[in-house]
Each structure stands twice: as structure tokens, then as C-alpha cells.
Amino acid sequence: SDLLEKNLSEILTKITWKKSMKWANYDLYWGRPLKSILAIFNKKPLNFVFNHINSSNKTFIDKSLEEGLKIFNNFNSYIKFFKQKGILIDQDLRKKIIQNKINEIINKKNLKIEQNDRLIDEIVNIVEKPAVIICDFDKKFLNVPSEILITTMQSHQKYLPTFDKKNNLTNNFFVVSDIKDTKGFVKLGNERVIEARLSDAEFFWEKNKTQNL
């Protein structure tokens, strides 16, 4: 623990972000505003200073879960607390849940998805309590080249397109949400979003076809 306390501050300074921010009167640039640093090792708090923050066994809890500071005495209690709130700390577990649900649906619908580990990993890291939803878009958009549709879904929206057994793109796609879609609102909202995106893609594709090379 002494070694960790001595080196953690320096290690944190070496973390870089594509985009950083500065807030209040602090000198620290970070991906998001830091309010606390929770650091525990062998059931004991680690004590070090990073910029303007002292580490401790306390952390702020999102107000949607529980107001104020929360004390954790070990990592297991940390995992247990968030699991009770429906949040899965273990990213490997989140990934497994997402993949299992997708496999369950594609087997039922006789579909398949393209293996895209980078996109899956990105999705895993932007959800806390993953809910997999299968959506669809108007089949008329399948007249647009599949490369354009796939790029629109994957790059812009972080959706997972589906294919039939002959590797043809279908009008079904997967959304991984942080909200259970009990009333179908998440599905409807994402279908509206992709409708707008694909309408734009279709417009520019048709426009480009009129241009001579």
C-alpha cells in the first residue's frame, strides 16, 4: 500500500484524454470534473493527493441512486452496493450479458451480426446496466449501399446492424440502452433517430449519383 500511495498521483497525471476540461478555479485538466477519488487496497483506504483532491474511502453517489457521500470499506461492498442499484461494475459481465442477449435474439430471428470487437467494447464502456433492444428501419433504405448504412449505424449511433444468412444487410439493428424498455419508448426513439440519419444518407447518395466523376 505504501508503494501505491507513493506512485498513484504520478500515475494519474499520465492519463491522457482526447478531450479534456478545466473547471472552477482548479488547474487540473481531465475528461470530466473530478469530485472525489475512492481508493482502497486490502480493505484499507489509500491516502494520496492528486491535484486538489485527497483520496479516501468515500465517493459521491449519483443523485438518481442515493444523495451525498458513500463510504466503502472494501471492493466487494462497492460491487454489491451498485449491483443492488442495477449497475454492473464488472465490464466483462456487462459484455457477457450484451453478447448473450444478442445471440438469443439473432438465433430466434435467424440473423447474424458482424464481429466488431471494437464497437462492442465501446458500447460496454458507455452503459452501466445494459438492456439489448432490437429495432428496425424502413426497408426502402436498403436501396442505399450497405456500406453507407453500416457506417451510419455503427459510427454515428453505436448501433449493431444485422445480416441474413447470405450476409445481406437487413433492416433490423441492435441498440444497447441503459434503460429497460418496458413501454417501447426507447425502441421508438432510436427508430426515429435512425430514420432521420438514413434519410440524410439517402439524400446525399442520390445527390452524388447525379455528379459525374
Residue spans for each PLM region:
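Long, basic N-terminal domains or extensions that often function
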Residues: 1-158, 163-167
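Function-dense linear segments that define catalytic or interfacial modules
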Residues: 161-213
